[in-house]
Amino acid sequence: MFFEQLPQQLVNGIILGSIYALLALGYTMVYGIIKLINFAHGDIYMMGAFVGYYAINSLKMNFWIALVFSMIVCAILGAVIEFLAYRPLRNSTRISALITAIGVSFFLEYIMVYFVGADTRSFPQSIKMYTYHFGSISVTNVQLLILVVALVLMVALQLIVKKTKMGKAMRAVSVDSDAAELMGINVNNTISFTFALGSSLAGAAGVLIGLYYNSIEPLMGMTPGIKAFVAAVLGGIGIIPGAALGGFVIGILETLSTAIGLSSYRDAIVYGVLIVILLLRPAGILGKNVKEKV
């Protein structure tokens, strides 16, 4: 029975994993450039879902315009959070920045609870759903859309990082921010751009997950945010392809856990696999062990 369901569950896992991958990319970019775990990232994903919800429901935008609008709003939100919450603490201890990140996370969650309530809302289905059958595998047009959008955004991110002037600045700052500043790179602008870029991907993921599961609520970012962080660590935090790979691995693990009747333990299985991977490869699947000079 399990092997009959395996192809379908792999497809479902890849779709879910593509959303985790988008989220994980935000974590890994921010960590790569300033060594900060931005635990508010999952809540930016939640904000993206709500921006998409109101853009479609209240502003009567179509799905594609709402998706871009959500990405823009979340990019601005990410840059503002970096400027107000993280920049003043850049020379402080890492624990100070970590506590601030957790505080920003709770602030975003409960300000949304205050303004929109804690109830779950149905995300508007602005795209008519069709199902395609390929042998024993069933795939909807919405699933295909999610996968294609996620892959396009991942490729676009890679092109930005590798081919653009700002991308080169990001890589320079991640290696040595002091040397980058001496070379004329505006470190503050580069870090703000990194937050904005990662947050825009989180906003896109929020809209896609709303379309996929047809429901959103103010606390929806907590668990996916942690899983995306796990995905980033699993693949090798600070490494963009590693974060994407980790996202797909987490998505497939979750759906396979459900397929074998262990849906109640799927989170435990994900974290268990993370522990095993880190025991075997402490830097993650694609990470490299680097000795830190003291």
Q: Which sequence ranges carry the predicted segments?
A:
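Glycine-rich phosphate-binding loops of nucleotide-dependent enzymes
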Residues: 36-39, 74, 136, 171, ...
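Membrane-embedded helix boundary and interhelical linker motif in transport proteins
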Residues: 11, 33-80, 84, 260
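Hydrophobic core segments of alpha-helical transmembrane domains in multi-pass membrane transport
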Residues: 49-53, 71-77, 104-111, 149-158, ...
